[in-house]
């Protein structure tokens, strides 16, 4: 338990400004759309925020664990330090941390069903599933160039649209447009990180779009995402 707590503190310093903000903004947008249509509710809104935060922490733990196992967290890595690679936590403790955050996210998701209905069960299950498939398994999606697509889905359509749906039980064109824009903006953060890490990713076998198509194309994709979202 102590090791998990130490990991939470360490990862909080590393990730809180980036990934947790990225988890909060789409939910805020969904809440704003619901409020504009006169359907905002504080309790489901807070549950949506909590679910998003727990899923993001869970994804951070999962990525930290499996990237370490795959050898992606090299000594020459330029990005934020990772808990497993730095020896802040044992692999067994990280497994327990993943299990704990997954369980807590499922509990919060179950509470959300009282407001959304059973139709949100597949969405919650997909959130859990793809949190693992991103870096785990025989075909880790982040290692095969699918990261950008997943960001647009799980930082756009899912948090924006589902937050709105939980309160309004509806889906509008405004929600669709806002979801796409939000997902593309947050994907620029992934694109920047992949551009920064392109040499290390190539050595580690992580074939992001920047690695596959080159640095020049990566810069153009970043520009396209920003302009299209605007």
What are these regions (language model features)?
Residues 62-102, 186-226:
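Solvent-exposed interhelical
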Residues 20-24, 42-50, 95-99, 121-125, ...:
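Hydrophobic alpha-helical transmembrane segments
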Residues 1-14:
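Short, small-residue-biased leader/transition segments that mark boundaries at the very start
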Residues 37-62, 121-132, 172-192:
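Membrane-embedded alpha-helical segments that form the functional core of polytopic membrane enzymes
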Residues 26, 51, 55, 59, ...:
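Alpha-helical transmembrane segments of multipass membrane proteins
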Residues 29, 33, 58-63, 108-112, ...:
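Alpha-helical membrane-inserting segments
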Residues 24-30, 149-164, 182, 211-215:
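Small-residue-rich segments of transmembrane alpha-helices in multi-pass membrane proteins
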Residues 82-170:
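Intramembrane alpha-helical segments
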């Amino acid at each position: 338990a102590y090791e998990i707590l130490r990991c939470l503190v360490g990862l909080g310093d590393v990730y809180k400004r980036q990934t947790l903000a990225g988890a909060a903004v789409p939910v805020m947008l969904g809440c704003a759309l619901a409020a504009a249509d006169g359907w905002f509710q504080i309790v489901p809104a807070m549950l949506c925020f909590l679910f998003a935060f727990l899923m993001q922490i869970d994804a951070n733990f999962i990525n930290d664990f499996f990237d370490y196992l795959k050898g992606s967290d090299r000594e020459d890595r330029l990005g934020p330090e990772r808990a497993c690679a730095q020896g802040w936590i044992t692999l067994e403790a990280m497994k327990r941390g993943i299990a704990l955050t997954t369980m807590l996210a499922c509990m919060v998701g179950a509470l959300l069903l009282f407001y959304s209905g059973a139709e949100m069960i597949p969405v919650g299950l997909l959130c859990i599933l793809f949190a693992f498939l991103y870096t785990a398994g025989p075909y880790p999606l982040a290692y095969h160039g699918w990261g950008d697509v997943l960001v647009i889905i799980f930082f756009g359509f899912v948090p924006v649209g589902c937050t709105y749906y939980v309160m309004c039980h509806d889906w509008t064109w405004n929600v669709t447009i806002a979801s796409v824009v939000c997902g593309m903006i947050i994907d620029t953060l992934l694109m920047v990180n992949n551009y920064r890490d392109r040499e290390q990713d190539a050595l580690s076998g992580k074939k992001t779009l920047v690695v596959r198509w080159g640095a020049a194309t990566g810069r153009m994709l970043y520009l396209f995402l920003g302009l299209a979202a605007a």
